[in-house]
A protein has these predicted regions:
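PRPP-associated nucleotide enzymes
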Residues: 2-197
Length: 197
């Protein structure tokens, strides 16, 4: 997951944007959650949330936040209903963890049964680990694009190496990788080789 799609245009050679949903979707399906709702922690991630919800046939909730300054939220509001729902927040990265912790706490206050988060890139700077541990999040699922600084009971890691290996194999053999970009055509080899730590 690129932080902004426009980054793809800054390379001199053709670049394919791979989406982490390919590795996260099997994990979400394995949870077998009823009353599932996908959420975005901010307006900028709404496109990602809608992509997940389309595949999972779920509702969508968007968090609207206002900041006083960088990494400090002054106000957050939910657009949508989470009462009686199992919510999964999806984002491309988690830095200080403030937004996700705030969103999870707000959703639990509004009646969510459980709140999980899926973030591709776990930067986890500052007091992020403590914020996650002390938040209403049931668990945080991340990829291994950035190694974790420490282990914690709430954080699970899903490896993206099977996805990369499959795409490199496909490119090397001059076959199409378009299936890697569609949520509903997740490659069976990748799904079967995904590991969770």
């Amino acid at each position: 997951d690129l932080h902004a799609d426009q980054i793809q245009g800054f390379f001199e050679k053709p670049v394919d944007h791979l989406y982490a949903s390919t590795i996260f979707m099997p994990y979400i399906n394995s949870l077998k959650l009823e009353n599932l709702t996908i959420a975005s922690p901010d307006m900028g991630g709404s496109k990602r949330a809608y992509a997940y919800s389309k595949h999972l046939h779920s509702d969508v909730v968007i968090c609207y936040k206002q900041r006083k300054k960088a990494n400090v939220i002054s106000h957050m509001e939910l657009i949508g209903d989470v009462k009686g729902k199992n919510v999964i927040l999806v984002d491309d990265m988690i830095d200080t963890g403030g937004t996700l912790a705030h969103a999870a706490n707000l959703m639990k206050e509004r009646g969510a049964l459980s709140v999980r988060a899926i973030c591709t890139h776990p930067i986890l700077s500052g007091g992020a680990y403590e914020k996650i541990e002390n938040s209403a999040l049931t668990e945080l699922i991340v990829s291994d694009t950035i190694p974790l600084k420490k282990a914690t009971s709430k954080i699970k890691v899903v490896s993206c190496s099977p996805l990369f290996a499959d795409v490199m194999h496909t490119v090397q053999n001059n076959t199409s990788i378009s299936g890697q970009f569609l949520l509903y055509t997740i490659n069976k080899k990748v799904m079967n080789s995904i590991t969770i730590k």
